[in-house]
Design a protein with these regions (language model features):
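Anion-binding alpha/beta catalytic cores of soluble intermediary-metabolism enzymes, centered on
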Residues: 2-266, 271-333
Length: 333
């Protein structure tokens, strides 16, 4: 990933404007390795959540130098009472008591999210041992959606070397969050995914995917993607959008010449909007496993601050890359 267009720019921007990122699983070996690398680069400061003694013991056990980073233990955090008070205010509609808030905030995922909410950190990366829901739920409850966003969605960035020597970079969404997004949500997701892709050097050309190409098939699912594409075109006239398209018509110039010769997107799409989470999750994993793409994500979109989720099967390199991506997004929210 280091030679991906856009990634070097992220690192350079972070060197000029360093950020602080929370890792909610401070004793995990992969997190410690990534934190050590980030500290060596001097452009990102990690906060490791956990018992200080346990974190230091784990770092020594695995052989990683985390000097220069910060360890914050929920059990002895000096601003914990302030955190409880703010949590109660944020969740007052649910009638949360201080006792309930304190208990919840002893959980690293909620504690770490509140560090971002309070401005102690700029971003958060979790999920090495948590489920996606355990990372996203605190973000929805505490960070909430940014102005103009009606939903939180996700994007995967897929990268592989090409014959030209430059990496091929694609964006896909929503592959992780919304089970069955509405037409309006799909239109918004298209914009968010396209904007995310720009950070990685993508000049977005957006395809709304279906089993039909511009009316070749019929059914509610086809209508949904066609209508979503039409709404997105109306809302974002500067963004090249086509839909509905079958995947071959979206990426193959030969197929596009036959099926939709007048489209400015068909045959050259690089940003793909799936009808639901089933298609999206299957699609990016096929690209990853059979197409030899490296997949980075899910990158959460639409929040007031960068909160991102790791796969529980991630390795340290993926943690390192996602930390840089997450922190860099703090410059653009």
């Amino acid at each position: 990933m280091d030679n991906m267009k856009g990634f070097g720019m992220m690192i350079q921007e972070l060197k000029k404007n360093p950020k602080t990122i929370v890792f909610t699983e401070g004793t995990d070996e992969r997190i410690l390795e990534a934190a050590s690398r980030l500290l060596a680069g001097s452009f990102l400061t990690p906060i490791l959540v956990g018992n200080k003694e346990a974190v230091l013991e784990a770092a020594e056990k695995y052989g990683y130098n985390i000097r220069g980073g910060e360890i914050i233990d929920p059990d002895d955090y000096e601003r914990f009472d302030e955190m409880v008070e703010l949590f109660c205010e944020l969740r007052k509609s649910k009638g949360v008591t201080p006792e309930q808030a304190a208990k919840t905030l002893k959980r690293n995922n909620y504690f770490g999210t509140m560090l971002v909410k309070m401005g102690v950190a700029d971003a958060l990366l979790g999920g090495a041992t948590y489920s996606t829901a355990d990372t996203v739920r605190p973000a929805l409850q505490l960070i909430k959606t940014k102005p103009g966003s009606s939903c939180v969605s996700s994007c995967f960035i897929l990268v592989r070397p090409s014959a030209t020597g430059e990496n091929e970079v694609l964006a896909m969404g929503d592959c992780a969050i919304n089970l069955k997004p509405s037409e309006d949500q799909l239109a918004e997701i298209a914009w968010e995914v396209a904007e995310c892709g720009k950070h990685f050097g993508i000049d977005p050309k957006v395809a709304f995917l279906s089993y039909s190409t511009l009316g070749s098939g019929k059914g509610e699912d086809v209508d949904k993607m066609r209508n979503a594409a039409a709404k997105a075109k109306e809302l974002y006239p500067s963004l090249p959008i086509e839909g509905e398209l079958q995947f071959d018509a979206a990426v193959s110039p030969r197929v596009a010449r036959t099926k939709c010769p007048n489209s400015e997107v068909a045959g050259q799409a690089n940003t793909f909007i799936f009808p639901d989470i089933n298609a999206g999750n299957i699609g990016y994993k096929i690209a990853q496993r059979l197409g030899n793409f490296d997949a980075y994500g899910p990158i959460l979109l639409g929040l007031n601050a960068p909160i991102n989720d790791l796969s529980r099967g991630c390795n340290a390199e993926e943690v390192y890359s996602m930390a840089i991506i997450t922190a860099a997004l703090a410059n653009n929210i």
